[in-house]
Amino acid sequence: LLQMCRNMSEMGQKILYVSGEESLSQIKMRAERIGNFTKDMLLLCVNNLEDVEEYVKKDTPKVIVIDSIQTIVTDDVESAPGSVSQVKEVTARLMRMAKQTGIAIFIVGHVTKEGTVAGPRTLEHMVDTVLYFEGERNAGFRVLRAVKNRFGSTNEIGVFEMKGTGLAEVKNPSQLMLDGRPDDTSGSVVVCTMEGTRPILLEIQALVCQSSFNLPRRTSVGLDYNRVNLLLAVLEKRGGIVMAGCDAYVNIAGGMRLDDPSADLGIVFALVSSFKNRAIPSDMVMFGEMGLSGEVRGVSGAEQRVREAAKMGFKTCIIPRSNLDNVKKMKDLGDMKVVGVANIQQALEYI
């Protein structure tokens, strides 16, 4: 947010950054790493909401950042900072200020160990938008994801890379996610998913090995565990490939989280590839939702997905047959071969 404030102040917008956690010297240390700031970037280190309101009356900014809501208190409520009553009252007053003055207000909130916003759920209900800034501890990129948005889709994401001078936008997330992918390795499949209106190529990795336990292990990282078990059952019943005595581990490379059902086809073939120890061609990409009867269902945004795969240099794309007619009309795919499959048996035969 401090970096965002700097960028907006350079555009001539007056920004007020209110910190209840850090001193001016601490903020200065972070700011010097990011770069120089203009005179339109204003810092205020207070914990009292009345002080913020008084300052806004004197010099109205375009944007206010509250860091964080758990440290700001109002004299109208007699309770400790961060309590339910304080958070609700301070948020309500800030919301009223935003509506009356037209100021955009960003509120920083603490999160729990589970990754959700700490404090009362009414905090999420009162605001217009809830954004989570996610990232693995050892990963070099961060994902800005919306879970509530009154003014647009919640499926849009932004991908950023951490650098020495702060966060930088990743203009081509697909290239970042596939960087370092090994060639001719079993259990590795590339799928094209949609995050809002943005197609992103991700690598699904699977490892299937003989189990030494009576109850085989099933582990998934970045994917719904129940979804993986469901696809294993479909693979056994409709595809004739039995993995009942095997441990199965599935992972999304790069630490991403994937909820798109169009990745089903990729998960299935990553498992089959590892089970048979036969590599899927490195220039092949696929997507499609798998039904319980083994059918491959059509997905939305097929044209954007195929176009993204062609742009990244893939030569073969396996898609649901119901999407094939629209994709065949595309003229900008170069020499890419697009194959439509109606069910899991056809897909297995082609591979």
List PLM regions with ranges.
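Conserved Walker A/P-loop ATP-binding site and its immediately adjacent core
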Residues: 20-26
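Conserved RecA-like ASCE P-loop NTPase motor core of nucleic-acid helicases/translocases
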Residues: 15-19
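Peripheral, non-AAA+ core regions of ATP-driven protein-machinery
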Residues: 2-6, 12-13, 28-42, 48-63, ...
